[in-house]
Each structure stands twice: as structure tokens, then as C-alpha cells.
Amino acid sequence: EFTLALVEDKVVGMGKLTVLFDGSAWLELLRVHPDFQRQGVGAKIYTRYLEQATAFRCPAIRMYTGAKNIPSAALAQKNGLHRGPEFCSMTLNLQNIPWEKEHLQGFCLANGQQAQELLLPMKEQAGGFFSINHTFYAVNPATCKGMAAAGWVYCAGENALVLGARFQPEKVWHIGAIAGDLEKNLRFAIARAAQCGVEQLSFH
């Protein structure tokens, strides 16, 4: 659901709640016009967030913010959220990166059962979350099955990776997880993304 905050029929803030594969609530796009910050607009949007999460019976509510975005973190904590793991991101520009068709060989899309078998053991290594488009998905069976259904889980024997995009797939694909031969997986990720005309790869 997309929420708008209005003052005298003027849009001064917005926010979106998305229900993820495991039913948890993901809070995103929270923005308040500079002229209306620190006036309770963000708090009102959070009130709506919590109403929605209750109505959807979400087992958890999560969000992402930059480590230096203190106001965003403070507002979230004021509304009952607490700090989770911190992640660093890396980006690779694919222009002029060499790749070969042979790097695609052996990989196929995993089904839900395969995804669970391959990805669940990675929970601790991944810090409990797989990230796609700065959306952090809790590692659990429902997430694994949902990612497989979305076409994000590739496998080749004991090698596996989560690779895809929740939005703007023409610009950036995100590596959510890697298991097995790191070099082989990365070569596949680069080749697959480049084959589809994607501009960048990102990894948390």
C-alpha cells in the first residue's frame, strides 16, 4: 500500500509498505518534504504503517536506512523498531567487462525445494538476510521458495547464487547470496547480467 500525507490537500510526505515472501512488512520510500519535517508527518506515516502491518498480520516489520541517516533510524526506533545488522555494498560496472558464453553453462533456475536446500544453510554466513535492491529478506523457507518463484535462484551442482532485481532490472542486478565456487558463481553472474544488457552488479 502506498501512503500519502496531506496538509491542506498538498502532498507533504509519502511511504510504502510491501509484504514480502514470508509475510513480513517492508517499509520503504518514506519521504517528508523539508518544509514539513519535524512536524509529526513521519510519525503519522508510521501510524499508518503499523495499522497496515496489523491488518496484514505481518510477523515482522523491517526497513533499510543508511548508517549515517540518524533521523530515519531515530524515527524507526521511536516506533518500536530496533537496529539490525549493518551491511556494506559493492558495485561492479559491467561496461567493458569481458565475459564468455561458456560461463553460463551448467547453471539453471532452482525450484523451491532446491532453493531451500541450497540457501537455508547460508543463513548465518549471510547475516540472516539476503539483499535485493536494498530490500533485506529474512532467510527462511518462505523466502527461499519466493525467490525461486521469482526466478532469482540459480544452481549448478553445489554452486548456487541469488541473482536478480526487484525493480529497475535494466540498470542493476543484485547478488543476494553465493554458495560454492566463488569464481564460477561470479563469472556466471557477470555473464548472465551482461547477456541481458544490465549495467551493473551490486552485492551486500
Question: Over which residues does each language-model region extend?
Answer:
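Amide-forming acyltransferase catalytic core, primarily the GNAT-like/NAT-type
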Residues: N79-P169
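Conserved active-site alpha-helix within GNAT-family acetyltransferase domains
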Residues: Q39, A43, A67-P85
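Conserved beta-strand in the GNAT
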Residues: L4, K10-T18, W26, R31, ...
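Short strand-connecting beta-turns/loops that link adjacent beta-strands
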Residues: E8-K10, L20-G23, K68, G84, ...
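A short, internal acetyl-CoA/4′-phosphopantetheine-binding micro-motif in the GNAT/acyltransferase core
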Residues: L30-Q37, W173-E183
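Conserved acetyl-CoA pyrophosphate-binding loop and the N-cap/start of the following alpha-helix
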Residues: F36, G40-R48, K184-F188
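Conserved GNAT acetyl-CoA-binding A-motif
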Residues: A25, A53-K68, L75, C196-H204
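Structural motif
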Residues: A110-Q113, G176-D181, F203-H204
